[in-house]
């Protein structure tokens, strides 16, 4: 049963075909990695899946439903969460408040109830706070919860973003280069964390440059080059794939 | 419609269309150099005509106009160097709000200096009753001045931007700021130049229409929004299109009297702006690609 | 609970200030203080839009005018001639009409002020909903220009329409009876009561926004302001949220306009002027953009001073200068404020003190 099924996905910018007829399936509860040299179209692919961009052609099936071209907030409501390559947190809000945004899709209170401070919203707020704290504790950043994220160390900010995505209890988590900017030790911890998250029942789709991380934790690897899928398989298969090695020749990866 | 009335509307459209086009050109020069909309653009037009009017009693008209243009240019430069340069780091919105504040202050200063009264300038040639005849239509010679000077402004700017070093430098800056500065062009000087030019052109435009439209301290705001409508219509940054758009809008406004009571004349133009913004913000003649090729 | 303090203070002032001013023989100040409260209400609505949703609007005065004119037009509309028509009969049966007599003693049959008021608010909300969707898709200067255009259109319409009184506006606007014995109206005898009404309304309006900011929707708005893309990815329907704040801002302005009109007994096209919109923006800017308390204090102070005539002929110029000054110095001012606050909290030790947008 695949959690994500892409077929014939294409998107051009001007004359440039950033993503060209890409199709693959990501199995439920797998950790699927998307790799490829710079400019291969990985981030564009992510944006097509999450709805930030709409494809010129092709379809995206998420958990059985067609979400092609759906607006990001609708996709999020269906159980897809993502992190961003450049950290996109609310700098002026605390870590806890940022994570609480993650609970937005799991709560209902609207403008009117908010303005009137309707009694039933108090219970909901409590639950939002509790669930957010769970995510924060899972990532081990509880000591930072009341600090403005703008002033936090980079690695901690990444954790806050991850906690935010987790708080939404997604079925599928999209991670956009989660290891970028992390040192060796932090990357190790990240690898363990991703596996732990998957083991809690979240399918993972990750774009990453760090090959050791990818080879270490992935169940499936999809390789893109110049917008096309050129290979897919288990880590060992990919490692010995001639074409894949070719496109990486000249690139220094761990 | 009677021929005379038609011509009256036509000429009115021509006159006001020209001044809107001049304001739009001023908007475009600054937009191309800085990416911001200068809400105070209309005030430059007001300043030019008011200063010239104040001076015209004491010196020959040509001198008064020249002085007004120079002084308004100085005002434009001052505005940029004293205020906008400081706010530039804060982002586009901050600069916009600053220009709004500046337009108010300039307007109030004009009110304090010259009062509420409506002022005018002497006709450049002849007087208010002289008229020329072309194809049976009577019109004031001032109209020729307006058309002529607007054409001169457009021609002059085209030559400036194509042939002079400064002009090419400005175009380089607007196309690629970093690249230009790597070539030794100081972007900040270009911005100052842009403001100076916009102010001077606005002042000149204000002077040439003043004999027919009169002027007073509060004309700036209306001109700004109409000038913006024209600029947006032609595609922000495209001044050649602005001229055509200006005439179009001027005519539209003038002839709208047929359908709509005079009191609502402005509403027509503003509705055009709103429809434009909602439907095709890149302008009638513009497109996303064209706006990246912005000329002057 | 600290965030409720400003609203509570307003409510307290509603009852404590009148006797205090009466005792110091400065009761005449109540009039300007009442009017200031209504103007601040409009500014608060704008603060929600500008500070929390990050959208600039130069058309707030337009919504103020819509509320003011609609409410006064509907409550001065003489339906006597149409008394026979079925609709009017129906309204009469349901008690939604009020009877009186005009200046000359002739019978006056009009919509009850409550009905007029509610209709005016609904109208403002409807117009906001209508233009909000396309307007809010715009960014930066296009948004500023579009809202400016909207404000100008409203001003031209109310100034140019005979039926709305043209340049003279509408007068003889009847009092708005909120409860038996309690009405929004001019007149010295009702001065203290009206002051209380205005400041209670202000307190309630502030309370609603304070609640909003710390609610789920408010959190989403703040996230939206800080990054639309991330907010959308987290499930926030950014377009709808922006529209909702826009409508809230419009409703606040309309309520303020309607109530002020009943208080003054008249309304003129000057209230729809662009300069008024600029004032609302200036007040929000001085207050600190996303700072409700700041807007409250700055608004009360500046409006009161302006209404007292302290700025004299330079009234408009002052607000223009304020805008410029805030733009020039606000960043530095805020940074200064933060670093001194930071020094204070550091001195208290790392007690995990909460920071964030002030409510």
Q: What residue spans do the PLM features occupy?
A:
Chain B
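Short, non-helical or kinked segments that cap or interrupt transmembrane helices
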Residues: 27-49, 89-94, 166-169, 187, ...
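Short loop segments and helix-boundary regions at transmembrane helix junctions
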Residues: 33-37, 74-118, 160-167, 221-236
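Membrane-embedded helix boundary and interhelical linker motif in transport proteins
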Residues: 11, 33-78, 82
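Membrane-interfacial amphipathic/re-entrant helices at transmembrane-helix boundaries
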Residues: 1-22, 51, 59-64, 90-95, ...
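Transmembrane alpha-helical segments in multi-pass inner-membrane proteins
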Residues: 20, 59-70, 192-202, 206-273
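Helix-loop-helix "hairpin" substructures at the membrane interface of multi-pass membrane proteins
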Residues: 16, 138-216, 239-244
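Alpha-helical transmembrane segments within multi-pass membrane transporters and channels
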Residues: 27, 59-102, 109, 244-249, ...
């Amino acid at each position: 049963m695949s959690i994500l099924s892409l077929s014939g996905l294409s998107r051009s910018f001007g004359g440039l075909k950033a993503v060209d007829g890409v199709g693959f399936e990501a199995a439920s509860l797998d950790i699927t990695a998307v790799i490829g040299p710079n400019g291969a179209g990985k981030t564009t692919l992510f944006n097509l899946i999450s709805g930030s961009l709409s494809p010129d052609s092709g379809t995206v099936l998420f958990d059985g439903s067609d979400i092609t071209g759906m607006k990001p907030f609708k996709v999020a409501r269906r159980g897809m969460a993502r992190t961003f390559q450049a950290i996109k947190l609310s700098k002026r809000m605390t870590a806890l408040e940022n994570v609480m945004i993650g609970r937005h899709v799991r709560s209902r209170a609207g403008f009117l109830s908010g303005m009137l401070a309707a009694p039933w919203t108090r219970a909901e707020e409590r639950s939002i706070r509790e669930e957010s704290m769970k995510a924060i504790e899972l990532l081990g950043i509880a000591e930072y919860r009341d600090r403005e994220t703008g002033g936090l160390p980079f690695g901690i900010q990444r954790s806050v973003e991850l906690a935010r995505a987790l708080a939404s209890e997604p079925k599928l988590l999209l991670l956009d280069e989660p290891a970028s900017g992390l040192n060796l030790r932090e990357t190790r911890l990240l690898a363990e964390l991703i596996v732990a998250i998957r083991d809690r029942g979240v399918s993972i789709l990750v774009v990453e440059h760090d090959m050791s991380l990818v080879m270490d934790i992935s169940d499936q690897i999809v390789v893109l080059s110049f917008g096309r899928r050129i290979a897919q398989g288990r880590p060992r298969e990919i490692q010995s794939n001639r074409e894949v090695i070719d496109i990486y020749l000249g690139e220094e990866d761990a | 419609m009677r021929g005379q009335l038609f011509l009256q509307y036509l000429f009115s459209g021509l006159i006001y269309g020209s001044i809107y086009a001049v304001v739009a050109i001023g908007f475009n020069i600054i937009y191309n150099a800085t990416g911001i909309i200068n809400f105070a653009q209309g005030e430059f037009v007001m300043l030019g005509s008011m200063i010239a009017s104040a001076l015209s009693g004491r010196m020959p008209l040509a001198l008064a106009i020249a002085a007004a243009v120079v002084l308004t240019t100085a005002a434009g430069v001052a505005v940029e160097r004293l205020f906008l340069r400081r706010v530039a780091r804060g982002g586009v919105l901050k600069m916009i709000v600053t220009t709004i504040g500046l337009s108010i202050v300039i307007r109030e200063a004009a009110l304090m200096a010259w009062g509420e009264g409506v002022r005018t300038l002497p006709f450049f040639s002849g007087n208010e009753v002289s008229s020329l005849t072309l194809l049976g239509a009577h019109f004031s010679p001032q109209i020729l001045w307006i058309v002529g000077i607007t054409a001169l402004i457009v021609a002059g700017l085209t030559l400036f931007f194509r042939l002079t070093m400064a002009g090419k430098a400005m175009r380089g800056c607007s196309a690629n700021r970093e690249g230009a500065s790597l070539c030794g062009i100081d972007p900040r000087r270009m911005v100052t130049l842009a403001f100076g030019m916009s102010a001077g052109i606005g002042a000149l435009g204000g002077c040439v229409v003043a004999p027919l439209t009169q002027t007073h301290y509060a004309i700036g705001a209306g001109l700004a929004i109409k000038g913006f409508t024209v600029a947006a219509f032609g595609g922000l940054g495209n001044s050649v299109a602005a001229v055509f758009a200006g005439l179009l809008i001027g005519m539209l406004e003038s002839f709208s009297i047929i359908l709509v009571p005079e009191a609502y004349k402005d509403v027509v133009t503003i509705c055009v702006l709103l429809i434009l913004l909602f439907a095709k913000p890149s302008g009638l003649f513009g497109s996303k690609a064209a706006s990246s090729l912005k000329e002057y | 609970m600290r965030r409720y303090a400003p609203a509570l203070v307003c409510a307290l002032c509603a009852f404590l200030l009148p006797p205090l001013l009466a005792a110091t023989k400065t009761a005449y100040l109540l009039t300007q203080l009442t009017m200031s409260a209504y103007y601040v209400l409009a500014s608060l609505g704008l603060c929600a839009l500008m500070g929390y949703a990050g959208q600039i609007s130069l058309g707030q005065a337009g919504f103020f005018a819509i509320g003011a004119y609609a409410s006064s037009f509907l409550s001065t509309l003489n339906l006597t001639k149409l008394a026979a028509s079925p609709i009017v009969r129906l309204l009469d049966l349901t008690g939604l009409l009020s009877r009186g007599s005009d200046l000359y003693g002739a019978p006056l049959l009009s919509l009850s002020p409550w009905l007029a008021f509610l209709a005016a608010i609904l109208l403002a909300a409807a117009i906001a909903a209508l233009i909000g969707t396309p307007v809010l898709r715009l960014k930066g200067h296009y948004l500023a220009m579009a809202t400016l255009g909207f404000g100008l259109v409203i001003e031209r319409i109310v100034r140019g329409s005979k039926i709305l009184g043209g340049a003279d506006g509408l007068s003889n606007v009847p009092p708005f009876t909120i409860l038996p014995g309690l009405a929004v109206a001019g007149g010295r005898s009702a001065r203290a009561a009206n002051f209380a009404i205005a400041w209670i309304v202000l307190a309630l309006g502030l309370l609603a926004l304070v609640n909003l900011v710390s609610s789920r929707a408010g959190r989403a708005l703040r996230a939206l302001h800080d990054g639309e893309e991330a907010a959308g990815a987290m499930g926030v329907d950014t377009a709808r949220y922006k529209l909702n704040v826009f409508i809230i801002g419009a409703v606040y302005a309309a309520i303020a306009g309607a109530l002020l009109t009943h208080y003054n007994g008249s309304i003129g096209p000057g209230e729809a002027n662009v300069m008024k919109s600029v004032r609302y923006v200036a007040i929000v800017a001085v207050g600190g953009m996303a700072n409700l308390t700041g807007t409250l204090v700055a608004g009360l102070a500046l409006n009161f001073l302006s209404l007292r005539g302290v700025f004299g002929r330079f009234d408009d110029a002052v607000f223009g200068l304020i805008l410029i000054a805030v733009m020039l110095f606000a960043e530095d001012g805020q940074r200064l404020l933060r670093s001194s606050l930071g020094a204070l909290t550091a001195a208290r030790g790392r007690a995990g003190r909460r920071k964030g947008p002030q409510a």
